[in-house]
Amino acid sequence: KSARGLRFLGCNELQIGSLDALEGMTELETVCLAGCGLWSIQPLSSGKKLRNVYLGRNNVSDLSPLIGCDIAEMYLDLNKLNGNSEAFRGLTVHGFIVMNGNGYAQEDLEYIRSTINGEADLEI
């Protein structure tokens, strides 16, 4: 049976390293991928139904594959965003983003909010 209709994926702490197997999974709504050793989330770009994205404790620096999703919850704590305020440009978030441990300061939050479509609560 095909997994292409998969809506929820939980692989926390599995050190999978790559999301290539998720390419083309357009029905995903929730991904729990914390602590998986990920550098790229590019295969998530076809999952425009994503609402809940848990990517804490990885090595992600590019969030652009999530453009086009309407995100409700996103955990990005302890990744490699390195204080890059432009990393959020074009994302749509109607909910919150947890982004502590990525080099952001309180004074960065207003600018980051201005690059996001929607109403996002930001937590550092």
Model-predicted regions and their roles:
Residues S2-S61, P65-E107, Y111-I124:
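Concave beta-strand-loop units of leucine-rich repeat
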